[in-house]
Amino acid sequence: MEVYNLRNTKEKILTATEQLIYKKGYTGTSINDILDETATGKGQFYYYFDSKKEACLAVIDNHVKIWQKHLLNGILSRDESPLANLKEMLDWIYSDHAQKKIYYGCPVGNLVIELSALDEDFRKPLEQLFSDLQKKIAENLSALTGLLVKQNLPAAHAIIAQIQGSLLLLKVTQDLNVLESNFDLLKTSFEKVGEK
């Protein structure tokens, strides 16, 4: 029972940290914010995390694991058609935002924007995640085009930029139709690649 409570407390702190950073940013989130949100004391926070930075690194690690499970090793690694995989990638991202009332942007993209230039410890896992995503998208594009994966890396990079740009526009407009419209255009471009 005690082990469950300890794990539960750590998860509660991690979840609150993730949500606060998503909404307020890393700089805008204080340890006191996390303590208030979780109704825990400093001792409990510092039992699990040495610092706010360490808690944020755990948040990044959690995002990486989710993306690896659902997107990199899931959707983009399926034996379905590569066109279906690429479209499903967009649907997965869209569905995460469609259920929200306020659009804060991409949780990972927000971390990249705020933290990549501040600290290598933050930048490295985020860069690796985007590099892995680029490779998986390129693999699917290669199956569509017949070109080598390395030949499709620039196009995969551009797709990531379009996705992140669309999420940035969603954040600034607070209009889900913007994301839907941009993703529909991306899906159409995937179909055109598949026709060649």
From Swiss-Prot:
UniProt xrefs under Gene3D superfamilies: Tetracycline Repressor, domain 2 (1.10.357.10)
Coiled coil: none
UniProt key word Mitochondrion: no
SUPFAM superfamilies: Homeodomain-like, Tetracyclin repressor-like, C-terminal domain
DNA-binding region residue numbers: 30-49
The entry's keywords: DNA-binding, Transcription, Transcription regulation
Protein name: Uncharacterized HTH-type transcriptional regulator in lacX 3'region
GO molecular function, one term: DNA binding
Classification via InterPro entries: Homeodomain-like_sf, HTH_TetR, Tet_transcr_reg_TetR-rel_C_sf, YxaF_TetR_C
Annotated ranges, domain HTH tetR-type: 7-67
PANTHER family: HTH-TYPE TRANSCRIPTIONAL REPRESSOR NEMR, TRANSCRIPTIONAL REGULATORY PROTEIN
Signal peptide limits: none
TM regions (residue ranges): none
A Pfam short name: TetR_N
Keyword Transcription: yes
